[in-house]
Amino acid sequence: YFSKVENFERMSFHSNYEDLNWDIVEVVFICVQTPNNTKTNSVDTKFLESAISKIAELNNKDIIITVKSTIPPYEIENVCNNIGFDQNLITFNPEFLREGSAVYDFFNPDRIVLGGLNTDKTDKLKSLYKDFDAEIIITDPISSQLIKYLSNTYLPMRLSFVNEATRLSKYSGANLQDVLKGVGFDNRIGSHYFRPSPSWGGSCFPKDLVEVNNFYKDGDLNLPLISNIIKSNNEHLNWTVQQMLMLKNDNNLNKIYLVGAAFKEDTDDLRNSPTL
């Protein structure tokens, strides 16, 4: 992609904040990782906190600090309190890029979500996307983050449904491909994200689902569908392994080759890959 860039004077890469010319900076997009903390089983915001803290040291309230990283609703309050920064100066622009097609997805978004309490900052942020042919949703910070989390909840739920349909088709002796094709032709359902797999994985769906379960369980709220998506995925992976073992034993096989170690096609990402 970078070979197509005509004017590299508009693009530069740096490994530390000091090398940047902050005098000309109007908007900062923070895209740091927010991994799952295995000790607390909750999102780790230390990278986000460090990034905001570095920018806050400039003491320039005109800079629009925009968080693209995925963090739970209300968590930005804790982050800003830890570093003594006004959370109302933060805007949000959650990303919905897919691994393997990130550049295409950036230029062809289904929607653009902007969250913030300062209308001047969100309006300026909106102007950056004036040439994009996509619906722009401007909302509050909490809603913008929940949009991202619920998107990353629905998609694995849909994948889990297909995988359960796979087991049901196998049990009943039905033709799985015909079943999914027949169901997917319903316009209310569609055929996108509707293929069976050993199970789903990756660096986003698992951790985001864990966090969704964390923040709704803090209150008196029961969400039986959402709370069982991970369980369904784990059970399908176990079922897949059992099917492979049966295939091995029934045919006296000594070796089984697995093609594709990444968690999805068109990527080399091995994080939380069900194959491994």
Language-model features: locations:
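Structural/interface elements that position substrates and couple domains in central-metabolism enzymes
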Residues: 1-276
